[in-house]
Amino acid sequence: MAPDTSLMDFFLFVLAIVVGLQFFKRREQQQRVQLLGRFLSPYQIEQQMERLLDGYLRWLGEDDPIRRDQIYGTLGTVETALAEQFERFATDAKAMPAPLAQVSKLPLWIPFAQPLLPGRLLFDVRQAFAIHARGIDAVVRNEEGRAPKARAYMLSAELLLMQHTCHWFCRGKAVATARLLARHQTPHAQVVASVSAQTRRDYLALIARR
């Protein structure tokens, strides 16, 4: 029996659409990666973040009190440098063109959709970076007088949420959330619950679908 050419044509048509959408999705995402990379390139934010998080793990896992104090003493300069660099980055990011700074609140990346989405389904990543900069700086300064372990835990959450925003900007929310879980074994909701109250209020207000 001869194959149903109309059905085959339909499947080929669908396949062509899927391949085309995947191509344009990758191109859009690569443009985002390059754009963010230009603003991040003057800084060592990612390297300092990794150094700090690794340092916290070594500090918390050290049994010798003297050695533990020595490790903690070296982390203060990293915290301060990271907060200062991210604040400068957030200031630089204000120069990002407004249309390119818009991020879809939808979980999946849909090619060509971003310029067509209503404002309530978009947020401005420049505002998100400003929220993260304030949150990181506030925890580093520790005006609330948190205990060292509580402060380290909260600062770690602030940094992970900031990293999630960077991935969301470049790859979409679903990919950012999956990366957070895969790399740090931490759900997005848990990170949001662990940042400072001010960061959480500002962040949730920004990403809410109003």
Q: Where does each model-flagged region fall?
A:
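A broadly tuned preference for mixed-charge, low-complexity surface segments
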Residues: D69, P99-Q114, R183-V191, L206-R210
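Regular secondary-structure segments
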Residues: E46-D64, A133, D137-E144, L160-H167
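Interfacial alpha-helical end/capping and short helix-turn segments at domain and membrane boundaries
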Residues: E79-Q163
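Glycine-rich, aromatic-bearing surface loops/beta-hairpins
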Residues: R146-R210
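Short, structured coil/loop segments at alpha-helix boundaries
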Residues: P42, D64, R68, P115-F129, ...
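N-terminal signal-anchor transmembrane alpha helix of single-pass membrane proteins
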Residues: M1-S41
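Generic structural signal of hydrophobic/aromatic residues within well-ordered alpha-helices
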Residues: R32, L36, I71, F89, ...
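N-terminal topogenic membrane-targeting module
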Residues: R26-P97
